[in-house]
């Protein structure tokens, strides 16, 4: 057989040759350094047979793909270590049943059914076993079995592997990887790719935690235990990641939500349903006020729609039954003689469409921009719910723009400007855009070919004019139109998808929307969906972690606390707090019978931006002694001067303090 090297040179090899044979043919240096290969654009290990005529580029430990290889093998090492861990506890290793063990961002995991529950306390012992396996430098071997042989290997022992084998299509290769020997090594059903031996894995890894995971993500199936690990090429990368992990725990919005009394999720109210406490509601209302101001300034018209809608509305839109699994079931009153069925609103767009359609529209009315803070409901699986970032009821800063095909670019530019204003106001400086366009090989898309081409071109032109750093992702468009979204990095460098703008040719067609053009004829409008915040709940969860609960003044639930030095100044403290409130600031006087330093410390713990200490001197001079969080004591100033500066900082929505 013939394969081709990166420079185009042919290399003759025996049938069934692998990348290992390529390395051997290129000399001792390559044979020693090679860890894998890129074969016709696909990642291979050194063990998988090469196809005839393949283009082969060998990889070394310096190549970025090396991380994928060793992380995958570490998942197998983890599974082997767990089996050895339970063998030492007196269990048959076969009693440890294995699900799947893929590579994920930063590391790997394995889903395991163990004879007794694993806990985070078990991880150091399992990790030590993994390091032993690396030191043994066990070579990996790849082999293929027939379907019957593969099933015989697991039948009656491991229902999860049996199920996976049964799902492999007829005629497709069923491959296994073995590290070490059959008696004391480990063999797993796997497509690969892997490193050549366990000794090639860098020792810079750590098992992080154990979590529950339903088999195949189905809450009606058995609950397995998912053991997570992270792995890097260097000790420095691992150290940096572990620091980020600890910092992320400190910033966890669920913990800070409790400590700062922002929100709660009460089991009696329901899983995934958020109760906004007074302080959290301040953050929510401030964000909504900011967005409302910006939208009105940009020509949006605000509407309000109900929390439920007729089932027929969602059948027409296609949201039902196509997305029925992620929706609450229909509400029926047929037993009361009511024929109409209802659905908790999963999307705002059908309601906005009916507002557009209630009368004839002219091209002179376009673009028509309808906006709403609309609450919608999705049935997320219980195991997928997570604080504010994955909930069952959430409010979107939703808007739908109805325009002519020629207006798409201008409207896109307008929405981009709004999204970038949001990012700038909140200090989200590190972002990139992704433009999702059609896959030319797919026929799943609806709408006119010429309109698609125009919209894709307009989106790219708008992104370029806005000065965005963007990539074009072929095949990422929805079936009903191209889109643009943003990937934003927070203070810890984590990436979040925000600010999606979606072109839609489908819904105007399904609802028969029209406008009368300049020619007096009826035409089909284009619809744009946009929500810069996305879900307010998720967005606030991200902001809590980005700011570590230390909000800028305009978002801070309590902006200033006035602390009297002694009982003699309590009246003045209340007077100062009253003045601040009258001016529009959120202020409190802390006159509890605690030591002054304890009250100042409590305000710090609650992340209040300003603490105003008042003693006899301040009372006599109509002044305040100002402490700014993270800056300390700023000295004494007239109350009027503080008020003027604080109001400017608040009203201008500044990120940095005035003082």
Swiss-Prot record:
Protein name (database record): Threonine--tRNA ligase
E.C. no: 6.1.1.3
The family this protein is said to belong to: Belongs to the class-II aminoacyl-tRNA synthetase family.
Lineage of origin: Bacteria, Thermotogati, Deinococcota, Deinococci, Thermales
CDD domains in alphabetical order: TGS_ThrRS, ThrRS_anticodon, ThrRS_core
GO molecular function terms attached to this record: ATP binding; metal ion binding; threonine-tRNA ligase activity; tRNA binding
Subunit structure comment from the entry: Homodimer.
Annotated region (Catalytic), positions in chain: 252-552
Role noted for this protein: Catalyzes the attachment of threonine to tRNA(Thr) in a two-step reaction: L-threonine is first activated by ATP to form Thr-AMP and then transferred to the acceptor end of tRNA(Thr). Also edits incorrectly charged L-seryl-tRNA(Thr).
Main location class: cytoplasm
Lineage: superkingdom: Bacteria
Binding site for Zn(2+): 349, 400, 529
Organism: Thermus thermophilus (strain ATCC BAA-163 / DSM 7039 / HB27)
């Amino acid at each position: 057989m013939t394969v081709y090297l990166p420079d185009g040179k042919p290399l003759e090899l025996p049938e069934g040759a692998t990348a290992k044979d390529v390395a051997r043919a290129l000399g001792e240096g390559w044979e020693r350094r090679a860890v894998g290969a890129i074969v016709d654009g696909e990642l291979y290990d050194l063990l998988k047979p090469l196809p005839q005529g393949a283009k082969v580029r060998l990889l070394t430990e310096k190549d970025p793909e090396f991380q994928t290889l060793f992380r995958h093998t570490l998942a197998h090492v983890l599974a082997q270590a767990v089996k050895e861990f339970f063998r030492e506890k007196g269990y048959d290793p076969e009693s440890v049943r294995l699900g799947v063990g893929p590579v994920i961002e930063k590391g790997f995991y394995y889903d395991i059914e163990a004879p007794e529950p694993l806990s985070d306390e078990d991880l150091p012992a399992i990790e030590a076993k993994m390091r032993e396996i690396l030191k043994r430098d066990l070579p990996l071997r790849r082999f293929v079995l027939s379907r019957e042989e593969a099933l015989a290997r697991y039948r009656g022992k491991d229902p999860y592997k049996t199920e996976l084998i049964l799902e492999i299509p007829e005629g497709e290769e069923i491959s296994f990887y073995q590290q070490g020997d059959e008696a004391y090594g480990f063999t797993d059903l796997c497509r690969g790719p892997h490193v050549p031996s366990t000794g090639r894995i860098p020792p810079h890894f750590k098992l992080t935690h154990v979590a529950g995971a339903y088999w195949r993500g189905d809450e009606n199936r058995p609950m397995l235990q998912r053991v997570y690990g992270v792995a890097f090429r260097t000790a420095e990368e691992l150290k940096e990641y572990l620091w980020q992990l600890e910092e992320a725990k400190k910033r966890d919005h669920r913990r800070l939500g409790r400590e700062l009394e922002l929100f709660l999720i009460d089991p009696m109210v329901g899983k995934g349903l958020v109760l906004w406490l007074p302080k959290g509601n301040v953050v929510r209302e401030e964000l909504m006020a900011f967005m409302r101001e910006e939208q009105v300034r940009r020509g949006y018209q605000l509407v309000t729609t109900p929390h439920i809608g007729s089932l027929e509305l969602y059948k027409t839109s296609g949201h039902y039954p196509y997305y029925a699994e992620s929706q609450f079931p229909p509400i029926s009153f047929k037993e009361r003689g009511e024929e109409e069925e209802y659905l908790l609103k999963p999307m705002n767009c059908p309601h906005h469409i009916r507002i557009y359609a209630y009368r004839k529209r002219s091209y002179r009315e376009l673009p028509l921009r309808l906006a709403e803070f609309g609450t919608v409901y999705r049935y997320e699986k219980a195991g997928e719910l997570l604080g504010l970032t994955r909930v069952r009821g959430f409010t979107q800063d939703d808007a739908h723009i109805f325009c002519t095909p020629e207006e798409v670019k201008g409207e896109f530019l307008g929405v981009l400007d709004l999204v970038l204003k949001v990012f700038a106001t909140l200090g989200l400086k590190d972002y990139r855009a992704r433009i999702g366009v059609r896959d030319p090989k797919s026929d799943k898309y609806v709408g006119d070919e010429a309109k698609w081409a125009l919209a894709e071109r307009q989106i790219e032109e708008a992104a370029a004019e806005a000065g965005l750093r963007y990539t074009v992702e072929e095949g990422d468009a929805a079936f009903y139109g191209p889109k643009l979204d943003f990937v934003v990095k927070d203070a810890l460098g984590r990436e979040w998808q925000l600010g999606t703008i979606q072109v839609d040719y489908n819904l105007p067609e399904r609802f028969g929307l029209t406008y009368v053009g300049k020619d007096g004829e009826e035409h089909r409008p284009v619809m744009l969906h946009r929500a810069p915040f996305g879900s307010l709940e998720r967005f606030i969860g991200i902001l809590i972690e980005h700011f570590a609960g230390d909000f800028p003044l305009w978002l801070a639930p309590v902006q200033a606390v006035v602390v009297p030095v002694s009982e003699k100044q309590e009246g003045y403290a209340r007077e100062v707090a009253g003045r601040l409130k009258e001016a529009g600031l959120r202020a409190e006087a802390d006159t509890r019978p605690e030591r002054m330093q304890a009250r100042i410390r409590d305000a710090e713990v609650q992340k209040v931006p300003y603490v105003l200490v008042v003693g006899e001197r301040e009372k006599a001079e109509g002044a305040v002694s100002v402490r700014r969080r993270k800056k300390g004591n700023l000295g004494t100033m007239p109350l009027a001067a503080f008020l003027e500066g604080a109001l400017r900082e608040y009203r201008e929505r500044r990120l940095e303090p005035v003082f």
